[in-house]
């Protein structure tokens, strides 16, 4: 598989700290973004633990495709899905343990959106409101559903999209790593095609930049150019939150 990737993060115009984190491992084909929550540096700690745990765990987990599952746990998934699921479980446990051991960080947690490219497939793990997009054949597809209060209201038909965008509860997420012992991450797969372009991003980007502009940027830019343009666009529109983007271009499957 021939691919190229680039990632970047920016604190934005309103925040001093950057609670976002990202992961790029071209050797493994593993990429991720995380958006920490909790304040008092807790968000920074949680997002860093998430991507570091993912990066450390996945090489070993992918190298143990035939290992016996722990007692009481059934492995019915594709080996890559199982590895990604286990890595998310380990990241959640690591954040949960840090919370319990550090009284200064009682409320910390993080979103996580991860992409694994392997065996001509894209494997995506997602929890929270960071997103994964696929730009294919001129169309932008959102591959993840936000785990947030307003997104759930839109899906239920209670809110319109306009109401969701202006709601004071639009930043309230309903799932995150580190909050509960069961992370409840969603995992999906998709067959790859030549010229697929993936975007992983935190809500600091999607709150500021419309899908139409994201499409134009992904259609006409290299991964590095795309990331730089998207971060700049979010800041030009106010940069009210930390902004993180990872763009992966599958040149040839």
Report residues per predicted region.
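PP2C/PPM-type serine/threonine phosphatase catalytic domain
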Residues: 1-253
């Amino acid at each position: 598989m021939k691919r190229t990737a680039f990632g970047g993060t920016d604190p934005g115009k309103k925040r001093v700290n950057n609670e976002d984190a990202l992961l790029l491992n071209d050797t493994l084909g593993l990429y991720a973004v995380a958006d920490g929550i909790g304040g008092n540096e807790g968000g920074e700690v949680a997002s860093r633990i998430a991507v570091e745990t993912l990066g450390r765990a996945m090489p070993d987990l992918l190298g143990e495709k035939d290992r016996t599952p722990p007692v009481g746990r059934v492995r019915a998934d594709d080996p890559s899905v199982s590895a990604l699921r286990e890595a998310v479980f380990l990241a959640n446990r690591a954040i949960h343990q840090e919370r319990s051991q550090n009284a200064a960080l009682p409320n910390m947690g993080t979103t996580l959106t991860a992409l694994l490219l392997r065996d001509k497939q894209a494997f995506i793990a997602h929890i929270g409101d960071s997103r994964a997009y696929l730009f294919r054949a001129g169309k932008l597809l959102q591959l993840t559903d936000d785990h947030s209060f307003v997104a759930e209201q839109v899906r239920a038909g209670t809110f319109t999209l306009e109401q969701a965008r202006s709601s004071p509860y639009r930043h309230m997420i309903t799932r995150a790593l580190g909050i509960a012992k069961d992370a409840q991450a969603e995992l999906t797969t998709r067959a790859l095609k030549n010229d697929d372009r993936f975007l992983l991003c935190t809500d600091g980007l999607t709150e500021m930049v419309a899908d139409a502009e994201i499409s134009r940027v992904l259609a006409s830019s290299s991964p590095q150019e795309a990331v730089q343009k998207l971060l700049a666009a979010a800041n030009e529109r106010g940069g009210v939150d930390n902004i993180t983007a990872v763009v992966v271009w599958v040149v040839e499957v």
